[in-house]
Amino acid sequence: MLSTPPKLPSAHGPVHFPRRSGTGMNRMARSATAVKTLAGLSFKRERAVLKSGMAPVAGADEAGRGPLAGPVVAAAVILDPKRIPAGLDDSKKLTATRREALFDEICATAEVSVVMAPPSRIDRDNIRQATLWALANAVKGLPEDPRLVFVDGNDRPPLECEVEMVIGGDGLIASIAAASIVAKVTRDRLMVGLGAAFPGYGFERHMGYGTAEHGAALRRLGPCRHHRTSFAPVRAQQLVLFETEMLEIEAEPLVDALV
């Protein structure tokens, strides 16, 4: 694990992870031959974009659509074609140790922007709209405006630049893979922090997903302010707690009469 955790993203604006070394992206060579071929990933589309002179090109992805608690985190990355970290892949296919190492390397060599949509926005807008908002603002927060953005999935975020949706893109496109790693590591670290701040839920283990442990904690403790109350399992526990409280209130006069 990295010795220094990243600054956590704000719901109000992007967080940048500036490269610690190397020349600016505007000055780097855009040659397609500068792109490395890494095992497990295809760079045909990125090569074509770079060869056409359509640069910079970015990748965007999110982490945390499905959990019952915590934010959805979106990341956008512009990779340096000459310094692509070796071994990039879908973050879900990597070990935690490998993700952490790649996170450090990506932040040191690429332009990175991260935005989170907190549970309050998810509950207000719905998870789809909150995710699209986070993805769009992560891209807008990059130091350079990309000419083209590769985005994982098939749901296009509202962006003025050209967007290419790629289903399974985090296992196909290097910049999407990098974004998926940044988003997941950032979110996992945040959930570990929430686990310490809200003991008993086990956030540091299940990262907010609907595991058996999490379900038991919800039944025992009820939801906290980091739960997504618009999600059915959380809403159901809220209803149970409300009904229990109402029964207790109704029973109070009877208890007083018996005392």
UniProtKB/Swiss-Prot annotation:
Tell me its cofactors. Answer: Mn(2+); Mg(2+)
Could you state one GO biological process linked to this protein? DNA replication, removal of RNA primer
UniProtKB keywords: Cytoplasm, Endonuclease, Hydrolase, Manganese, Metal-binding, Nuclease
Task: Give me the segments passing through the membrane.
Answer: none
What catalytic activity does the UniProt entry give for this protein? Endonucleolytic cleavage to 5'-phosphomonoester
Instruction: Show the segment(s) annotated as Disordered.
Output: 1-26
Cofactor note, please? Manganese or magnesium. Binds 1 divalent metal ion per monomer in the absence of substrate. May bind a second metal ion after substrate binding.
Q: Which GO terms describe its molecular function?
A: manganese ion binding; RNA binding; RNA-DNA hybrid ribonuclease activity
User: Which Pfam family, an example, fits this chain?
Assistant: RNase_HII
Q: What subcellular compartments does it reside in? A: Cytoplasm
CDD domains in UniProt: RNase_HII_bacteria_HII_like (cd07182)
Give Gene Ontology CC terms. Answer: cytoplasm; ribonuclease H2 complex
> What Gene3D superfamilies does the annotation carry?
Ribonuclease H-like superfamily/Ribonuclease H
Residue positions binding a divalent metal cation: 61-62, 152
At the top of the EC hierarchy, this enzyme's class is: hydrolase
The chain positions of domain RNase H type-2 read 55-243
EC number in record? 3.1.26.4
NCBIfam families with a match to the protein in the record: PRK00015.1-3
Give a short account of what the protein does: Endonuclease that specifically degrades the RNA of RNA-DNA hybrids.
Q: Which family does it belong to?
A: Belongs to the RNase HII family.
Q: What is this protein called?
A: Ribonuclease HII
